[in-house]
Amino acid sequence: MIRRYWNINLKEMLETGVHFGHATRKWNPKMAPYISAKRKGIHITNLTRTARFLSEACDLVFDAASRRKQFLIVGTKNKAADPVARAAIRARCHYVNKKWLGGLLTNWSTTEMRLQKFRDLRMEQKTGGIHRLPKGDAARLKRQLFHLQTYLGGIKYMTGLPDIVIIVDQQEEYMALQECITLGIPTICLIDTNCDPDLTDISIPANDDAIASIRLILNKLVFAICEGRSSYIRNP
């Protein structure tokens, strides 16, 4: 895999607070190699290592995107939801940003049925079929459609398991991570100082609580994905 330059600089990461970890009492000792200092009871992440692993992750997703691989971005907590949706839409990736439904990947046949139901209801809505139903039935289907849009809207075009899953908060998305591990799907995780780097394939040490930090990391990754997709288009 060829190493590329992704314009990752320490000043930008400092300005967005990527280096701020959790309170020292909440740390995971496995994160010791990624921590450079303690400041006012908070662990400080080693940004040199963050830059290195982020660059490696960008190389990986570029290479995967250039081979038409499919990505799923997961981040369901409030601070991650909007950056995840924006990043995924920009890079034409699938995403989950509201709630991880148990078995979403490991019980894919059930997820496929839900997605088909979602597509059918969307078509009914577009063609006006729902509005021609009795008022009670129409209201029930509209509620069902709203529920499916909320939780499956980001994966409505997904036709199979993703090739790579990008996870914003390892602890918050532990169920998603476990499903990826079970299925052998490679993962890229933002890991804060309270996380376990051994659980993911590529760990990016970073503040997973600050919107600016999340946005910066995701922007670098989706830029690499977009570049990879462009590379495929230029060299099919």
UniProtKB/Swiss-Prot annotation:
Gene3D superfamilies: Glucose-6-phosphate isomerase like protein, domain 1 (3.40.50.10490), Helix hairpin bin (1.10.287.610). InterPro entries: Ribosomal_uS2 (IPR001865), Ribosomal_uS2_bac/mit/plastid (IPR005706), Ribosomal_uS2_CS (IPR018130), Ribosomal_uS2_flav_dom_sf (IPR023591). GO terms for cellular component: chloroplast; mitochondrial small ribosomal subunit. One of its GO terms (molecular function) is structural constituent of ribosome. The keyword Phosphoprotein does not apply. Keywords: Chloroplast, Plastid, Ribonucleoprotein, Ribosomal protein. It is found in: Plastid, Chloroplast. GO terms for biological process: translation. NCBIfam families: rpsB_bact. Belongs to the universal ribosomal protein uS2 family. PANTHER family: 30S RIBOSOMAL PROTEIN S2 PROKARYOTIC AND ORGANELLAR, SMALL RIBOSOMAL SUBUNIT PROTEIN US2M. This is Small ribosomal subunit protein uS2c.
